[in-house]
Amino acid sequence: SEVWISSVQPYNAYGYQFGWEQMQQMQDMGLFLRGVKTKLKDNGDDYYGIIRESTSRSIPSAIIEHCHVDESRDTPYCQTEEDWKKFGREDALSVAKYFGLSSASLGVDYSGEADALPEVSLQSILPATVRDKTEPDICQLTLQNADYETGEVSLEVTAADYDCPMMYYDYSTDGGRTYSELLPWPGLDIMAGTYPDTFTFSVTFTKGEQPVITVRGYNQADLFTESDPEIG
């Protein structure tokens, strides 16, 4: 899940606060969060027309991408009409919480929710919403253990991006010719902007095989840096 917002203040700040609330609802559903972001054209204007034109009319706006239908981890959330309706209800709940609405007839009171929104500045674009244009600064792979009886290799990944969070990783066992599916970065908290810069994972191989393993670390902008290979 991700939310696209305007790069223009104060709509950038309004959008970030709404997107933050929306991300809480999507997280509660179990979806993987990709954050609240801006996307710009080459001339610096907002890329998406609905956002650009809304801002020009002084109307706050946001585009919500609930999930990707071609992503295997997302498809369980968007298969039926009831799934789609649930997204709509969660969107409405995000709006109600953002504005701090209450209803005696419905028995709900979100008047305190608005006070829990993250603090923002109306003077400049929020750094967390700026799309990074460079690859991660570091991506290193270290062989921890190779058990040739069981065919299991344990590896340590160390990676960092000094401009935005790490988002995914994938790995290759054939020296980079083919790669696994993208895997979520372990321990990532995209809304806090935090992630562990080191984690371990294991791969299995056929007995007698000597894999050549590489890892790619991806940042929030989907740009990657590839590690040097390790021979298992």
Language-model region placement:
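A short, glycine/acidic-enriched catalytic loop
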Residues: S1-E21
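Sec-exported extracytoplasmic/periplasmic mature domains
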Residues: V8, M23-F32, D83, A92-G100
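Active-site-adjacent substrate-binding region
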Residues: G15-G44
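Acidic/polar loop patches that form or flank catalytic/metal-binding clefts of enzymes
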Residues: F32-V36, A104, E226
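Surface-exposed intrinsically disordered loops and tails
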Residues: G35-D46, A114-D115, L122-R131, P184-Y195
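Long, low-complexity serine/threonine/glycine- and acidic-rich segments characteristic of extracellular
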Residues: T134-D137, L141-G232
